[in-house]
UniProtKB/Swiss-Prot annotation:
Lineage of source species: Bacteria, Pseudomonadati, Pseudomonadota, Acidithiobacillia, Acidithiobacillales
EC top class, as a word: hydrolase
Protein name stated in the entry: Fructose-1,6-bisphosphatase class 1
Gene: fbp
Short name of one Pfam family: FBPase
Quaternary structure and interacting proteins, as annotated: Homotetramer.
Any one GO BP annotation for this protein: fructose 6-phosphate metabolic process
Membership in a protein family: Belongs to the FBPase class 1 family.
Organism: Acidithiobacillus ferrooxidans (strain ATCC 53993 / BNL-5-31)
Cofactor binding notes: Binds 2 magnesium ions per subunit.
InterPro entries: FBPase_C_dom (IPR044015), FBPase_class-1 (IPR000146), FBPase_N (IPR033391), FBPtase (IPR028343), Fructose_bisphosphatase_AS (IPR020548)
Binding positions for Mg(2+) 1 per the UniProt entry: 92, 114, 116
Compartment annotation: Cytoplasm
Cofactor(s) the protein requires to work: Mg(2+)
């Protein structure tokens, strides 16, 4: 499809790729994007309506919730629970799955989401976003159970995010590549602006929080040290570091112009070997990156192959340019020898 196509038209055209499609999924995606428009508007108006700052509560992760975390979470729940497309929902901000109201028919999909990734940055105007993952319910027409959500990332039927920054963008994939849409506020519609986004196999940019260097395992320390040595080191070229501190913003940059993102294994707390949540962040972003020609790994395991052990499981994440990710994996395996 061509640049300038509306999201509504794009969804209809894409639905035709699936013989026998009922239209349920198209309806689900349209309803979800409506909630993303609402959240984007709240983010942009945050300081004007007193929506910035802490809500005075913690989420299941033990993290301080921002007011916009709660607003965004409620926006998605209330936009989606009445539609009849879903059997259940799970949110990073909630301990347990969210049940569909009793008077609403149960659908055949499950929605998992991080309502406002990077919300700690809202007070300083840095890009944030909503990340989502859609799975098929193992049994359609009944209430979703906890085990239904614990599917490996390869089972996702759709993944994406909405980015709230200099513009409101929606980026998603249903397994036919990655496409990006920009919200035209004059008509209230997302318009195709980034067709078939691709990640180059090689890169000279990396994203990592260098302040944690001493806590990483040796393979990651080796990899980053070599990048920092630039032309004087074994890579024999210079690399640039970019770090926003908002995963959705860092991954968006990689989808637009390439790079590698690392939030590696951290040895400070054995109970939290990684910071990022498998179901709400790692799986959907890994799906997008692979669809764009990149790779995603924990350092030892392909992320999309991991069978979740719980709703809020955390893992290390290394994703982006295929050749760079494979190099980091090889360092973990001890199989990469400098020529």
């Amino acid at each position: 499809m061509h640049i300038g196509t509306t999201l509504s038209q794009f969804i209809i055209e894409e639905t035709r790729l699936y013989p026998g499609a009922s239209g349920d999924f198209a309806g689900l995606l349209n309803d979800l994007t409506t909630s993303c428009k609402f959240i984007g508007a709240q983010v942009y108006r945050g300081a004007l309506v007193g929506a910035l700052g802490s809500a005075g509560t913690d989420n299941v992760q033990g993290e301080v919730q921002k007011k916009l975390d709660i607003i965004s979470n409620e926006a998605i729940l209330k936009s989606m629970d009445w539609t009849g497309h879903l059997a259940g929902m799970a949110s990073e901000e909630m301990d347990d799955p969210y049940p569909i109201p009793r008077n609403i028919p149960r659908g055949k999909y499950l929605l998992l989401f991080d309502p406002l990734d990077g919300s700690s940055n809202t007070d300083v105007g840095i890009s944030v976003g909503t990340i989502f993952s859609i799975l098929k319910a193992p049994v359609a027409g009944r209430d979703a159970e906890l085990a239904d959500f614990l599917q490996p990332g390869v089972e996702q039927v759709c993944a994406g995010y909405a980015l709230y920054g200099s513009s409101n963008m929606l980026v998603y994939s249903t397994g036919y590549g990655v496409n990006g849409f920009t919200l035209d506020p004059s008509i209230g519609e997302y318009i195709l602006t980034h067709n078939q986004m691709r990640i180059p196999e090689d890169t000279s940019e990396y994203a990592i929080n260098m302040s944690n260097h001493r806590h990483w395992q040796k393979p990651v320390q080796r990899y980053i040290d070599e990048l920092n040595q630039g032309t004087d080191g074994p890579r024999q070229r210079d690399f640039n570091m970019r770090w926003v501190g908002s995963m959705v913003a860092d991954v968006h940059r990689i989808l637009c112009r390439g790079g590698i993102f690392l939030y590696p294994f951290d040895q400070r707390d054995p109970k939290k070997p990684g910071k990022l949540r498998l179901l709400y962040e790692a799986n959907p972003m890994s799906y997008l990156v692979e669809q764009a020609g990149g790779a995603a790994s924990t350092g030892t395991t392909r992320i999309l192959d991991i069978v979740p052990q719980g709703l809020h499981q955390r893992i290390p994440v290394i994703l982006g340019a295929k050749n760079e990710v494979e190099r980091v994996v090889a360092y973990h395996q001890g199989s990469f020898v400098i020529p």
